[in-house]
C-alpha cells in the first residue's frame, strides 16, 4: 500500500510541493525569502482580519476606531503594530527576494519572474490602500497626491481620478472602496503566489552557481523545511523586538493627527518602501513624464530576461556585473533617502542623477558588462 501523502489527492499536492520536492543541495539562505514572504502574508492576513473586526471605514469614525483598537481592544495595540510593521517586513523580504533573483539570474525562469512582478504590483497596491485606512493626515494627503497622478493620463485622466475617488475629492466613498480592496487583495496575492510556485516547480529552483543541479538534488523535507523554519524563527525574533520596542520608528508622526482637507502637511511622502519610486517620480519636472518613470521603475524588472547577455547565469563569477549590482543597490538606498527629503537643492540634482543611474545600470551597463565578461572568458 502506498503512503497516504503519495496517494491522497490533496496530500499529494502538498507532498510534491513541500516534502518530496527535489531541491538543489547548495541553495543558500538567500533562498529563504520565499517562505518568509509566505509567513509575512499569513501574518498580515491574520492580523488584518482581527483589525477589520473593530475598524470602521467611515471618514467620521475611521481615525477614532483605530484609536479605539489601540486603547480598548484586548491586545489591539499589538495587533495594530504587528500589521503596520508587518508591511515593512513584507517589503524588506520582497526587495531581498528580488535582489537575490537579479544576482543569481533567477529571472531566466521567465514565467515565474513575470508572475513575481505581478505579485509586486499587487502588494504595492495593497500597501498603498492600507496606508489610507487610518485616516490620519499623511493617509489622506498621500491618497490625494498619489491617486491624483492618474490625472496626467491624456484625455481620460481627470474622469479616471474622479471615478476612483467616487466624487470630486478623497472622501467617504474613497475610504470605503479602499477598505474593500485592501481586504480582498491579500487573498488574490495568496492565489497568485500559488501560481508563482506552480511555475517554479515546473523548472525547479535555481542555485548560487547558476548551473543545472539535476545531478545533485535532495528532498525538500527535512533539509529545507528545517532551514526555512530556522529562518522564520530568526526573522520573527527580530520582528517582534522591533514591534515591541520601536513600533513607531517607520511610521509618520503626521498620521497621529486626524485627516484635515484644509491643512496640508509641509512634506507629503509615502511609506519608506515606496520612497525610491517616489524619488524617481519627482526627479522629472513634468507630471506625465514622472508618472511614466514611476511605472517604469518597477516594470523595468520585466526586461531583465531580455537584457541578459552573459554566457553565465549567476553573477557569482562575474566581477564587473557584481560591482554594477552593488552600485544599483547603493543607488536605491540613495533614492530612498532622497524620496524622504524636501524638493530643494541639493536634493533635486542628487535625485535626478540617482534616477538616471538606476535606469542606466539596468538598461545599458549590465548588458554591456555581460558582453565584456564573455569576451574576457574567451581570452
UniProtKB/Swiss-Prot annotation:
Transmembrane spans: 33-53, 77-98, 113-133, 178-198, 226-246, 288-308, 320-340, 347-367
Residues annotated as binding heme b b562: 83, 182
Entry membrane topology: Multi-pass membrane protein
Record key words, sorted: Electron transport, Heme, Iron, Membrane, Metal-binding, Mitochondrion, Mitochondrion inner membrane, Respiratory chain, Transmembrane, Transmembrane helix, Transport, Ubiquinone
Identification of the protein by name: Cytochrome b
Cofactor descriptive note: Binds 2 heme b groups non-covalently.
One GO-annotated biological process of the protein: mitochondrial electron transport, ubiquinol to cytochrome c
Cofactor: heme b
GO terms of molecular function: metal ion binding; ubiquinol-cytochrome-c reductase activity
Annotated organism of origin: Chaetodipus pernix (Sinaloan pocket mouse)
Cellular-component GO terms for this entry: mitochondrial inner membrane; respiratory chain complex III
Assembly notes: The cytochrome bc1 complex contains 11 subunits: 3 respiratory subunits (MT-CYB, CYC1 and UQCRFS1), 2 core proteins (UQCRC1 and UQCRC2) and 6 low-molecular weight proteins (UQCRH/QCR6, UQCRB/QCR7, UQCRQ/QCR8, UQCR10/QCR9, UQCR11/QCR10 and a cleavage product of UQCRFS1). This cytochrome bc1 complex then forms a dimer.
Note: Heme 1 (or BL or b562) is low-potential and absorbs at about 562 nm, and heme 2 (or BH or b566) is high-potential and absorbs at about 566 nm.
Sequence positions that bind heme b b566: 97, 196
Function: Component of the ubiquinol-cytochrome c reductase complex (complex III or cytochrome b-c1 complex) that is part of the mitochondrial respiratory chain. The b-c1 complex mediates electron transfer from ubiquinol to cytochrome c. Contributes to the generation of a proton gradient across the mitochondrial membrane that is then used for ATP synthesis.
Cell location: Mitochondrion inner membrane
Main subcellular location: mitochondrion
Cell cycle keyword on record: no
Family (UniProt): Belongs to the cytochrome b family.
InterPro entries the UniProt entry points to: Cyt_b/b6_C, Cyt_b/b6_C_sf, Cyt_b/b6_N, Cytb/b6-like_sf, Cytochrome_b, Cytochrome_b_C_euk/bac, Cytochrome_b_N_euk/bac, Di-haem_cyt_TM
Record: residues binding a ubiquinone: 201
Amino acid at each position: 500500500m502506498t503512503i497516504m501523502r503519495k496517494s491522497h489527492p490533496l496530500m499529494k499536492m502538498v507532498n510534491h510541493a513541500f516534502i518530496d520536492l527535489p531541491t538543489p543541495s547548495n541553495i543558500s539562505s538567500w533562498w529563504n525569502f520565499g517562505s518568509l514572504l509566505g509567513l509575512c502574508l499569513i501574518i498580515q492576513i491574520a492580523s488584518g482580519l482581527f483589525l477589520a473586526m473593530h475598524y470602521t471605514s467611515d471618514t467620521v469614525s475611521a481615525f477614532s476606531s483605530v484609536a479605539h483598537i489601540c486603547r480598548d481592544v484586548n491586545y489591539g495595540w499589538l495587533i495594530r503594530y504587528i500589521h503596520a510593521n508587518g508591511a515593512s517586513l513584507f517589503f524588506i523580504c520582497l526587495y531581498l527576494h528580488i535582489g537575490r533573483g537579479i544576482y543569481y539570474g533567477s529571472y531566466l525562469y521567465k514565467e515565474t519572474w513575470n508572475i513575481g512582478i505581478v505579485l509586486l504590483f499587487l502588494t504595492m497596491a495593497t500597501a498603498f490602500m492600507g496606508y489610507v485606512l487610518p485616516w490620519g493626515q499623511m493617509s489622506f494627503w498621500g491618497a490625494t497626491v498619489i491617486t491624483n497622478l492618474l490625472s496626467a493620463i491624456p484625455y481620460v485622466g481627470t474622469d479616471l481620478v474622479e471615478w476612483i475617488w467616487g466624487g470630486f475629492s478623497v472622501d467617504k466613498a474613497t475610504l470605503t472602496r479602499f477598505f474593500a480592496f485592501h481586504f480582498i487583495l491579500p487573498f488574490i496575492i495568496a492565489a497568485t503566489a500559488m501560481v508563482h510556485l506552480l511555475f517554479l516547480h515546473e523548472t525547479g529552483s535555481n542555485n548560487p552557481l547558476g548551473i543545472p543541479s539535476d545531478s545533485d538534488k535532495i528532498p525538500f523535507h527535512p533539509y529545507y523545511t528545517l532551514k526555512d523554519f530556522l529562518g522564520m524563527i530568526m526573522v520573527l525574533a527580530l520582528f517582534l523586538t522591533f514591534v515591541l520596542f520601536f513600533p513607531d520608528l517607520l511610521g509618520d508622526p503626521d498620521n497621529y493627527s486626524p485627516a484635515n482637507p484644509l491643512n496640508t502637511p509641509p512634506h507629503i511622502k509615502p511609506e519608506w518602501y515606496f520612497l525610491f519610486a517616489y524619488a524617481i517620480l519627482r526627479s522629472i519636472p513634468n507630471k506625465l513624464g514622472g508618472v511614466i518613470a514611476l511605472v517604469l521603475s518597477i516594470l523595468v524588472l520585466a526586461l531583465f530576461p531580455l537584457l541578459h547577455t552573459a554566457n553565465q547565469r549567476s553573477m557569482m563569477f562575474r566581477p564587473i556585473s557584481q560591482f554594477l549590482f552593488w552600485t544599483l543597490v547603493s543607488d536605491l538606498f540613495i533614492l530612498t533617502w532622497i524620496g524622504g527629503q524636501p524638493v530643494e537643492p541639493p536634493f533635486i540634482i542628487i535625485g535626478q542623477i540617482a534616477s538616471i543611474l538606476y535606469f542606466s545600470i539596468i538598461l545599458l551597463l549590465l548588458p554591456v558588462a555581460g558582453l565584456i565578461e564573455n569576451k574576457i572568458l574567451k581570452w
